[in-house]
């Protein structure tokens, strides 16, 4: 069995991971559909709270990332809620919204359904060695609601290792320019 690109690299912070992975995609990325891609990429951030992308070519917006995070925390899939928080609705969300102006791939809406966060907390409190503390975001029963946007994140698993909370995020797809920069901030 050959597993391509399964190198698990340790980075100091999100910006270092961004710069490294962007370079890897540009050099080693395979043509796939209308983009370049790397499959089966995994990495660890030593300091996950250092989650600002400072690469000047990217011009990442902390203000927008904070607004998107607040939108997710609200659990409201309405793009109007994001507009209320951020002051405007970014065109990408207008494009991805359904006829009710909702985005069902909204992570907050997904993880709040079925009280998944409470479930994870209870599992970890009951057994700090559990492997069942996981949140499911992508749900095959909801294919029809993903008509314009399928969640990039499949699931998030929480474990306690060395008395610290670890989080592993499994992604279906994550573009380096927009998806990675904002998703890593949320997680």
Residue ranges and their predicted role:
Residues 1-187:
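Terminal, non-catalytic protein-protein interaction segments that mediate quaternary/complex assembly
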